[in-house]
Amino acid sequence: MQILFVASEVGPWSKTGGLGDVAGALPQALAERGNEVAVVTPRHGSIDPRAAGLQPVRTALQVRGEPVSLWVKRGPAPVYFVEHPHLFGNRRGLYGEGGRDHGDNAERFAFLTRAALALPGALGLRPRILHLNDWQCGLGPWLLRHEHARDPALAGARTVFTIHNLAYQGLFPKQVLPALGLPWEVFRWEAMEFFDQLSFMKAGLAFADALTTVSPTYAREILTPEGGASLDALLRHRARDLHGILNGIDVHAWDPARDPHLPAHFTAGDLAGKAACKAALQREVGLPVRPEVPVAGLVTRLAEQKGIDLVAAALPALLARDVQVVLLGSGDPAYQETFARAAREHPDRVAARIGFDEGLAHRIEAGADLFLMPSRFEPCGLNQMYSLRYGTVPVVRAVGGLADTVEDFDGVARGTGFRFSEYTPQALLTATRRALDVFRDRRAWRGLVERGMAEDNSWERSAARYEALYRTLAP
């Protein structure tokens, strides 16, 4: 099956979050299953064509009469980079700079989507599925129906629109409609109007043939007023077309048996290397090397979506136990100072590294005994799956993908982690204390570790589910 996959970021070339991970991995997994997949994304200013190994593409591609240059990264699922010096090439941030969105994001991503829809005709492709991701590509289904209705390259093509995070909706003043080349008739409540603004996210939800999001539980949550970000009524109307498909993880980049970031390697059958990773982590972050003390890890944005307010509130009571805490992250300056101060006040119990370090993120996953993810909401989440693969027991709030990937320990021989439901510091503390109590039972803890490491969270599993959905749309 021919598939055109469109995303505003594609790892490793451009990435601000989970979308970049998905766009970098899912098309490759689909290609490995025998599908013909092409990916379309902007050539952001941070991408050096020469350093990235991109090749120029000779094409007659145009968007609204304007010639468009194109680059390609060859591979099983070739990635086409759309060039536009003003809209993409001269920007530092993908979506904004200095904490503010770029003022022309509507024009930027309308241009990307139009370029993606014009690309099959220019390159001789005949995709049966257009897989469009997040608000940046939300105009795609409408544009396919109204600007490409007679395009032979897209004849019979069906659209899949994936919600990676419903909280980001692509909202713009209605006055941008003429600049986008959209008729005023789309500015209706049953189309793209959203509280007197233009919503790219709503456009995708209203007009795509199928909707997906990144976990089954998140798919249910966004049907409710509490989780639907004011789009729940539309989503309930489209509930039959909404599918929750879990993201996967890159099991090659995240493999404790081969990870180049680790000082020692290990498997479920031989955990000696994990003990060595724990000691090395304690040394690296300046904590006493004490193998008998449980280490709780966090790799996170310091933002309330991630439940960091719960961690901050629960930390004093947690430190009443004999435990060490290692945190890596950045975000809200107030929380940065909270954890930096905790590290200063408890230098033998707390280590806080403000910023991001890919290698240290891997070493925390490998060296910690448990991993805290008390998110307020979490469409999918990746770190809990990394933790399972690295034998690090997750303590999670049972929302979104966390609920779908972590089974609560039953006290005997089932479960892969510890879950809680209420969004309170006490609920987090109770779940963490459960984990610390079980940590002292080496046999029960070993069972938790081994069951977690046996979980299949590969992209192969996710790709099979997407492929099954595609075939219901384009048999």
Curated annotation (Swiss-Prot):
Which one GO biological process term can you cite for this protein? Answer: glycogen biosynthetic process
Q: Main EC class of this protein?
A: transferase
Tell me any Pfam family this protein matches. Glyco_transf_5
The reaction(s) this protein catalyses: [(1->4)-alpha-D-glucosyl](n) + ADP-alpha-D-glucose = [(1->4)-alpha-D-glucosyl](n+1) + ADP + H(+)
Q: Name one GO molecular function term.
A: alpha-1,4-glucan glucosyltransferase (UDP-glucose donor) activity
Organism's domain of life?
Bacteria
Q: Which GO terms describe its cellular component?
A: cytosol
What this protein is reported to do is described as: Synthesizes alpha-1,4-glucan chains using ADP-glucose.
Report the family membership: Belongs to the glycosyltransferase 1 family. Bacterial/plant glycogen synthase subfamily.
Query: What protein name applies here?
Result: Glycogen synthase
Source organism of the structure: Anaeromyxobacter sp. (strain K)
